Protein backbone atom coordinates (compact mmCIF):
# COMPACT_ATOMS: atom_id res chain seq x y z
CA UNK A 1 0.00 0.00 0.00
CA UNK A 2 1.24 3.46 -0.95
CA UNK A 3 0.47 6.44 1.27
CA UNK A 4 1.54 10.07 1.39
CA UNK A 5 2.63 10.62 4.99
CA UNK A 6 3.81 14.22 4.74
CA UNK A 7 2.74 17.12 2.52
CA UNK A 8 3.24 20.86 2.67
CA UNK A 9 3.20 23.92 0.43
CA UNK A 10 6.73 24.78 -0.66
CA UNK A 11 6.58 27.92 -2.84
CA UNK A 12 4.98 29.64 -5.83
CA UNK A 13 6.80 30.90 -8.91
CA UNK A 14 5.68 33.12 -11.78
CA UNK A 15 8.82 32.45 -13.83
CA UNK A 16 11.40 29.73 -14.27
CA UNK A 17 13.98 31.91 -12.52
CA UNK A 18 11.83 31.87 -9.36
CA UNK A 19 11.48 28.11 -9.11
CA UNK A 20 13.32 26.40 -6.24
CA UNK A 21 16.62 24.66 -7.00
CA UNK A 22 16.02 21.03 -8.02
CA UNK A 23 16.20 18.74 -5.02
CA UNK A 24 13.77 15.85 -5.54
CA UNK A 25 12.04 14.18 -8.45
CA UNK A 26 9.04 16.21 -9.59
CA UNK A 27 5.55 15.32 -10.82
CA UNK A 28 3.89 17.99 -12.95
CA UNK A 29 0.10 18.29 -13.12
CA UNK A 30 -1.17 19.96 -16.27
CA UNK A 31 -4.66 20.50 -17.64
CA UNK A 32 -7.40 22.91 -18.58
CA UNK A 33 -8.83 25.33 -16.06
CA UNK A 34 -11.58 23.72 -13.97
CA UNK A 35 -10.43 20.18 -14.78
CA UNK A 36 -9.67 19.46 -11.14
CA UNK A 37 -5.89 19.65 -10.68
CA UNK A 38 -6.04 21.11 -7.17
CA UNK A 39 -8.73 18.63 -6.16
CA UNK A 40 -6.72 15.67 -7.42
CA UNK A 41 -3.55 16.83 -5.68
CA UNK A 42 -5.45 17.22 -2.41
CA UNK A 43 -6.91 13.73 -2.77
CA UNK A 44 -3.53 12.19 -3.59
CA UNK A 45 -1.94 13.68 -0.48
CA UNK A 46 -5.12 13.16 1.59
CA UNK A 47 -5.39 16.83 2.55
CA UNK A 48 -8.45 18.89 1.70
CA UNK A 49 -6.82 22.30 1.67
CA UNK A 50 -3.22 21.89 0.51
CA UNK A 51 -3.68 22.97 -3.11
CA UNK A 52 -5.98 25.95 -3.52
CA UNK A 53 -8.40 26.42 -6.40
CA UNK A 54 -8.75 29.93 -7.79
CA UNK A 55 -12.20 31.48 -7.57
CA UNK A 56 -11.62 32.80 -11.10
CA UNK A 57 -10.56 29.91 -13.37
CA UNK A 58 -7.65 30.82 -15.61
CA UNK A 59 -6.59 33.76 -13.46
CA UNK A 60 -3.71 32.24 -11.54
CA UNK A 61 -0.42 32.26 -13.45
CA UNK A 62 1.69 30.78 -10.68
CA UNK A 63 3.55 27.48 -10.66
CA UNK A 64 2.84 25.99 -7.23
CA UNK A 65 5.21 23.52 -5.54
CA UNK A 66 4.24 21.01 -2.86
CA UNK A 67 6.72 18.94 -0.88
CA UNK A 68 5.60 15.39 -0.12
CA UNK A 69 6.90 12.18 1.43
CA UNK A 70 5.47 8.93 0.05
CA UNK A 71 5.66 5.66 1.96
CA UNK A 72 5.66 2.16 0.50
CA UNK A 73 6.34 -0.47 3.10
CA UNK A 74 9.37 0.81 5.01
CA UNK A 75 10.55 2.93 2.09
CA UNK A 76 10.12 6.72 2.29
CA UNK A 77 10.28 8.57 -1.02
CA UNK A 78 10.42 12.39 -1.30
CA UNK A 79 8.59 13.91 -4.27
CA UNK A 80 7.68 17.43 -5.27
CA UNK A 81 4.24 17.90 -6.83
CA UNK A 82 3.99 20.82 -9.25
CA UNK A 83 0.62 22.41 -10.03
CA UNK A 84 0.81 24.34 -13.30
CA UNK A 85 -1.59 27.14 -14.25
CA UNK A 86 -4.74 25.94 -15.98
CA UNK A 87 -4.96 26.64 -19.69
CA UNK A 88 -7.70 27.32 -22.20
CA UNK A 89 -10.09 29.41 -20.13
CA UNK A 90 -12.37 31.38 -22.45
CA UNK A 91 -12.34 34.63 -20.45
CA UNK A 92 -8.57 34.99 -20.72
CA UNK A 93 -7.31 36.97 -23.71
CA UNK A 94 -5.63 35.16 -26.60
CA UNK A 95 -2.46 37.15 -25.97
CA UNK A 96 -2.36 36.08 -22.33
CA UNK A 97 -3.00 32.43 -23.24
CA UNK A 98 -0.16 32.58 -25.79
CA UNK A 99 2.19 34.12 -23.22
CA UNK A 100 1.29 31.46 -20.63
CA UNK A 101 1.79 28.72 -23.18
CA UNK A 102 5.26 29.93 -24.09
CA UNK A 103 6.24 30.23 -20.44
CA UNK A 104 4.97 26.75 -19.62
CA UNK A 105 6.72 25.12 -22.56
CA UNK A 106 9.96 26.83 -21.54
CA UNK A 107 9.47 25.66 -17.97
CA UNK A 108 8.79 22.06 -18.98
CA UNK A 109 11.79 21.95 -21.30
CA UNK A 110 14.27 23.47 -18.85
CA UNK A 111 13.24 21.85 -15.57
CA UNK A 112 15.47 18.79 -15.49
CA UNK A 113 14.06 17.39 -12.25
CA UNK A 114 10.65 16.64 -13.81
CA UNK A 115 10.20 12.87 -14.03
CA UNK A 116 6.48 12.59 -14.77
CA UNK A 117 3.81 14.63 -16.52
CA UNK A 118 0.23 14.04 -15.39
CA UNK A 119 -2.29 15.45 -17.86
CA UNK A 120 -5.80 15.76 -16.46
CA UNK A 121 -8.73 15.53 -18.88
CA UNK A 122 -12.43 15.99 -18.11
CA UNK A 123 -14.02 12.62 -18.89
CA UNK A 124 -17.12 14.39 -20.18
CA UNK A 125 -15.07 16.09 -22.90
CA UNK A 126 -12.31 13.65 -23.93
CA UNK A 127 -11.84 14.93 -27.48
CA UNK A 128 -11.14 18.64 -27.09
CA UNK A 129 -8.47 19.93 -29.46
CA UNK A 130 -6.70 21.86 -26.70
CA UNK A 131 -6.15 18.65 -24.70
CA UNK A 132 -4.86 16.85 -27.79
CA UNK A 133 -2.47 19.73 -28.45
CA UNK A 134 -1.20 19.62 -24.86
CA UNK A 135 -0.63 15.85 -25.09
CA UNK A 136 1.27 16.28 -28.37
CA UNK A 137 3.34 19.13 -26.91
CA UNK A 138 4.38 17.05 -23.92
CA UNK A 139 5.23 14.13 -26.18
CA UNK A 140 7.39 16.38 -28.33
CA UNK A 141 9.46 17.88 -25.51
CA UNK A 142 9.75 15.06 -22.99
CA UNK A 143 13.09 13.40 -22.48
CA UNK A 144 13.84 9.70 -22.40
CA UNK A 145 13.87 9.64 -18.60
CA UNK A 146 10.42 11.22 -18.36
CA UNK A 147 6.99 9.64 -18.59
CA UNK A 148 3.51 10.99 -19.19
CA UNK A 149 0.11 9.66 -18.19
CA UNK A 150 -3.46 10.75 -18.67
CA UNK A 151 -5.86 11.00 -15.75
CA UNK A 152 -9.52 11.32 -16.64
CA UNK A 153 -11.40 13.24 -13.98
CA UNK A 154 -15.10 13.47 -13.16
CA UNK A 155 -15.81 9.90 -14.25
CA UNK A 156 -18.82 9.92 -11.93
CA UNK A 157 -20.53 12.28 -14.38
CA UNK A 158 -20.66 9.53 -17.03
CA UNK A 159 -23.02 6.58 -17.15
CA UNK A 160 -21.48 3.14 -16.79
CA UNK A 161 -21.55 2.42 -20.51
CA UNK A 162 -19.65 5.61 -21.35
CA UNK A 163 -17.20 4.93 -18.52
CA UNK A 164 -16.45 1.50 -19.98
CA UNK A 165 -16.00 2.90 -23.49
CA UNK A 166 -13.53 5.51 -22.28
CA UNK A 167 -11.56 2.93 -20.29
CA UNK A 168 -11.37 0.67 -23.33
CA UNK A 169 -10.27 3.57 -25.52
CA UNK A 170 -7.48 4.60 -23.13
CA UNK A 171 -6.28 1.38 -21.45
CA UNK A 172 -3.09 3.01 -20.14
CA UNK A 173 -4.86 5.96 -18.49
CA UNK A 174 -5.97 6.42 -14.89
CA UNK A 175 -9.57 7.17 -14.04
CA UNK A 176 -10.99 8.91 -11.01
CA UNK A 177 -14.37 10.31 -10.11
CA UNK A 178 -12.60 12.83 -7.86
CA UNK A 179 -14.24 10.80 -5.08
CA UNK A 180 -13.60 7.37 -3.60
CA UNK A 181 -10.39 5.76 -2.48
CA UNK A 182 -10.02 3.16 -5.22
CA UNK A 183 -9.43 5.62 -8.04
CA UNK A 184 -7.01 7.71 -6.01
CA UNK A 185 -5.06 4.64 -4.88
CA UNK A 186 -4.56 3.63 -8.51
CA UNK A 187 -3.28 7.11 -9.35
CA UNK A 188 -0.80 7.03 -6.44
CA UNK A 189 0.48 3.63 -7.52
CA UNK A 190 0.90 4.69 -11.14
CA UNK A 191 2.59 7.97 -10.23
CA UNK A 192 5.16 6.32 -7.96
CA UNK A 193 5.86 3.50 -10.40
CA UNK A 194 6.48 5.90 -13.27
CA UNK A 195 8.61 8.31 -11.23
CA UNK A 196 10.82 5.44 -10.08
CA UNK A 197 10.98 3.96 -13.57
CA UNK A 198 9.49 0.66 -12.49
CA UNK A 199 7.75 -1.75 -14.83
CA UNK A 200 4.01 -2.34 -14.55
Swiss-Prot record:
Keyword rRNA processing: no
Cited HAMAP family: GTPase_EngB (MF_00321)
Cross-referenced NCBIfam families: GTPase_YsxC (TIGR03598)
Lineage: Bacteria, Pseudomonadati, Campylobacterota, Epsilonproteobacteria, Campylobacterales
Cofactor(s) this protein requires: Mg(2+)
Keyword GTP-binding: yes
InterPro entries: G_ENGB_dom, GTP-bd, GTP-bd_ribosome_bio_YsxC, P-loop_NTPase
Pfam hit, one: MMR_HSR1
Listed transmembrane segments: none
Superkingdom of the organism of origin: Bacteria
Protein name according to UniProt: Probable GTP-binding protein EngB
UniProt keywords, alphabetically: Cell cycle, Cell division, GTP-binding, Magnesium, Metal-binding, Nucleotide-binding, Septation
Alphabetized GO MF terms: GTP binding; metal ion binding
GO cellular component terms attached to this protein's record: cytosol
One GO biological process term: division septum assembly
Binding site for Mg(2+): 38, 60
EngB-type G domain segment(s): 23-197
Function: Necessary for normal cell division and for the maintenance of normal septation.
Binding residues for GTP: 31-38, 58-62, 83-86, 153-156, 175-177
Recorded family membership: Belongs to the TRAFAC class TrmE-Era-EngA-EngB-Septin-like GTPase superfamily. EngB GTPase family.
